[in-house]
Swiss-Prot record:
Broad class of the protein's primary localization: cytoplasm
Underlying gene: dapB
Name of this protein: 4-hydroxy-tetrahydrodipicolinate reductase
Keyword Amino-acid biosynthesis found: yes
Similarity section: Belongs to the DapB family.
Known role: Catalyzes the conversion of 4-hydroxy-tetrahydrodipicolinate (HTPA) to tetrahydrodipicolinate.
Known EC number: 1.17.1.8
MF terms in GO: 4-hydroxy-tetrahydrodipicolinate reductase; NAD binding; NADP binding; oxidoreductase activity, acting on CH or CH2 groups, NAD or NADP as acceptor
Residues reported in the UniProt entry to bind NADP(+): 36
GO cellular component: cytosol
Pfam families referenced in this protein's UniProt entry, alphabetically: DapB_C, DapB_N
Length: 270
């Protein structure tokens, strides 16, 4: 049976990549596409927007009125919009792949509450490679973390509105959890002026925003005389789109629960 997927933010960079990925994947179809109220793209053919030709799926405005047209919704938009979409899907019993970043604590609580009614995959990054890196970071932290300085450097395109990236924060959280630290108290997100010596238990973050960088993350485990670097560089958003489609297939038969790509890829059994 073909899985019907809906995409919100269909006219954005990520939305178009998602449409392409769904079109190319087996066992799924794009059955609904949505854009924000007042968008000039409403009424357009989603396939033509994504550059794959006419597919007969019209970009619409109202998610609520068209929720019966999809089985799983993929959302890579903004926190305020994503929470509205999530509430609609929870009311309609539709599972969600959530790739939006930048949620505050209240937003994260709303996601957890919705997961009591529907299945949700919530991940900061849907790249298979990045999620493998998360696992490698845990192993490196276990071996080196208490004996070295840890720094996370991330770079993205000039249009990204949040910093550090959700992926960088997830990397920090994986490391902090492994070391028994709290990222809220051990994370250092800005250094300026006379900062004093670096504390050994800090987890530092550095952010770069430039041009059209898709996404690059490098983590240093730096000791005196040697440094281990674990890095991931994305050259195309298609890697994120393909991962999201893979997650949509995985979540299709789940009744409820909050999951991430570790669950989708079964990384805990590596």
């Amino acid at each position: 049976m073909t899985l019907r997927i809906g995409v919100v933010g269909a006219g954005g960079r990520m939305g178009r990549q998602l449409i392409q990925a769904i079109h190319a994947a087996e066992g799924v179809e794009l059955s609904a596409a949505f854009e924000r109220k007042g968008s000039s793209l409403i009424g357009s053919d989603a396939g033509e927007l994504a550059g794959i030709g006419h597919i007969g799926v019209t970009v619409e405005e109202s998610l609520t009125d068209r929720a019966d047209n999809f089985d799983v919704l993929i959302d890579f938009t903004r926190p305020e919009g994503s929470l509205e979409h999530l509430a609609c899907c929870a009311a309609k019993g539709k599972n969600v792949i959530l790739g939006t970043t930048g949620f505050d604590d209240a937003g994260k609580a709303a996601i957890k509450a919705a997961a009591e009614k529907i299945g949700i995959v919530f991940a900061s990054n849907y790249s298979v490679g990045v999620n493998l890196v998360f696992k490698l970071l845990e192993k490196a932290a276990k071996v080196m973390g208490d004996y070295c300085d840890i720094e996370i450097i991330e770079a993205h395109h000039r249009h990204k509105v949040d910093a550090p990236s959700g992926t960088a924060l997830s990397m920090g959280e994986h490391i902090a959890k492994t070391l028994g630290r709290d990222l809220k108290t051990h994370g250092v997100f800005c250094r300026e002026g006379i900062t004093g010596e670096r504390k050994r238990d800090e987890i530092g973050f550095s952010t770069i925003r430039a041009a059209d960088v898709v996404g690059e993350h490098t983590v240093w485990f730096a000791d005196i005389g040697e440094r281990v670097e674990i890095a991931h560089k994305a050259s195309s958003r298609m890697t994120f789109a393909n991962g999201a489609v893979r997650a949509a297939k995985w979540i299709a038969d789940k009744k409820q629960g909050l999951f991430d790509m570790t669950d989708v890829l079964d990384l805990n059994n590596l």
